[in-house]
Amino acid sequence: MKKWLIMSVGLLLCLASCQQGEKRAISDEQLAEVFTLAKYQYVMLDQQLTDSTMPRTVQADGSLRTSDLNWWCSGFFPGALWYIYEFGHSQNISYMAMKQTQKLLPLLDMNTDHDIGFQLNCSFGNAYKLTGNDLCREVLVEGARKLAARMNPTTGVIRSWDFLRKGWKYPVIIDNMMNLELLMVGAQLSGDVELGLVARTHADTTMKNHFRPDYTSYHLVNYDPETGEVLSRETVQGYADESAWSRGQAWALYGYSMMYRETRDERYLAQARGVADMLLKRLPEDGIPAWDLDDPSADALRDVSAAAIMASAFIELSEHTGEAAYMHMAERQLLTMMTPEYLAKPGENGGFLLKHGVGNLPEKSEVDVPLSYADYYFLEALVRYWKHEV
């Protein structure tokens, strides 16, 4: 295994050096080492799956815990495989990525929440960018139309969940900003401008109702579907309703950076910058946030998933603005995640890359464990960094 890893690092380093020649905070050699590890770990994960399962996290005994294909994270594993393929161009990984992507085709027959954006855009979207596959294109357009059908013109937002609890009538979470990319992709591929309009309307309404004056975001806004009135603002997965749940802030940063890329609407850029500048003031020196920015505990758990999402978004925002501070924070976060404290060794961590993710601490679900979406956005951030022109 050690010989295989050394040979793979050498090949990937050659490919990376052709892509970038200037010295940067994260070297081509470091990038190649991570992607070699990723290839090894993800082959290991692939071997443990069935036709109806995807990696989710690890069990208490360290063994792999899988999910069914309906789980909101099901698109992250195939999407991560496409990033590994994009960096190293392994045909074996390409085959594996397409196999895992096509497992998600049954999702087109379901429309029970907003997560079809995560599920399809991260998998079929990445596949289409790299292969131009016609089936992937068709899936993206159909998926976008299903997502758009969840829009209520009265509320001006896409409903997140169909299940109701705690007095919810029409719950919308900040995570939903991420699903808008599927709408923008679907609009571009189909020429259906209505899909893009739905995305813009949701982004505008979220900007109005989800954020506090300091640019921190609530997790959930509950609307009256008949009047559009805001009934409550909550932070379901955070420390308190008025706290800044870290992954929610990451979704906000990423979502508005993406919407600016897709629309060039300066309002979205201003919103992304507001969130980014707030984070620069509140993140710790190593860039890895506590699971909630307002958890007062000195030993509050860190959430590597929030850091990975932020790093990817900071890189994109730095390219939109030319602001060096955003790139420097992304570099700091990535370098920290590449240390042994956070990055697994070959064969460990159930096959996942990153350790110390926090899923839903209030519900004591997936706490201080690897998470598929942490790996996905970590690899995306590294690919974005690799392709970034210095």
List PLM regions with ranges.
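C-terminal motif of bacterial Sec signal peptides marking the signal peptidase cleavage site
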Residues: 15-17
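Sec-dependent N-terminal signal peptides
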Residues: 4-13
